[in-house]
Curated annotation (Swiss-Prot):
Stored PANTHER family: UPF0398 PROTEIN SPR0331, UPF0398 PROTEIN YPSA
SUPFAM superfamilies: MCP/YpsA-like
InterPro entries: YspA
Source organism of the structure: Brevibacillus brevis (strain 47 / JCM 6285 / NBRC 100599)
Protein's recorded name: UPF0398 protein BBR47_29830
HAMAP family reported for this sequence: UPF0398
Pfam family, one: YpsA
Family: Belongs to the UPF0398 family.
Length: 188
């Protein structure tokens, strides 16, 4: 049973998304929403993210929107270390803090500031071991930062009842085509 879902994927810059106006962002959010609604109908209770900019924060925005219709849904933000946002641009920090303050649970794997890249790998292991499944926006044909997490999740899924779900480039393309068809149909 999937009650705790870890959501992760590409960072915004890996997808070439630098602002809210990028048309690809709406497609990614629609894909996330579609999957989350499907899981909510199967008793999903928690969405867990680490607060990484990109897919994780877009998933958090989607969760906050879905909470209006699914009030039992909860958002957990478990960062790898304390104050991960402190070196980001002020505007980005404000965006991050606005979302994180609305989470139902906030914590850090390490109760210290950044000490090394190893904390990121340990964060992935921690979140995988404290969730029932992962939804990963990742396409193996377009490698990026989620590659390591994808391999860890696949290994865990192969050796247990852990569930690995992916949204890949083909899924996103299908949603883009649906939107184009809707626009076309609406024009008549």
């Amino acid at each position: 049973m999937l009650k705790r879902l870890f959501v992760s994927g590409y960072k915004a810059h890996e997808l070439g998304i630098f602002n809210e106006k990028n048309p690809g962002l709406a497609i990614i959010k629609k894909a996330l929403k579609r999957e989350l609604v499907r899981f909510l109908e199967e008793e999903l209770e928690w969405v867990i993210i680490s607060g990484q900019l990109g897919v994780e924060m877009w998933a958090a925005e989607t969760v906050l929107e879905l909470k209006k219709e699914y009030p039992h849904l909860k958002l957990a933000v478990i960062t790898p270390f304390l104050n991960q946002e402190e070196k980001w641009k002020e505007e980005t920090q404000d965006y991050y803090r606005n979302i994180v303050t609305q989470a139902d649970y906030i914590n850090s794997v390490y109760q210290t500031p950044y000490q090394g890249a190893w904390q990121l790998g340990e964060k992935d292991k921690f979140l995988l071991s404290n969730s029932d499944g992962i939804l990963l926006v990742y396409d193996e044909e377009n490698e990026g930062s989620p590659k390591f997490l994808s391999k860890l999740a696949a290994k865990k899924a192969d050796n247990s009842d852990y569930q690995l779900f992916r949204i890949n480039a083909y899924d996103l393309q299908a949603i883009a085509e649906e939107q184009q068809q809707e626009l076309y149909n609406d024009s008549f």
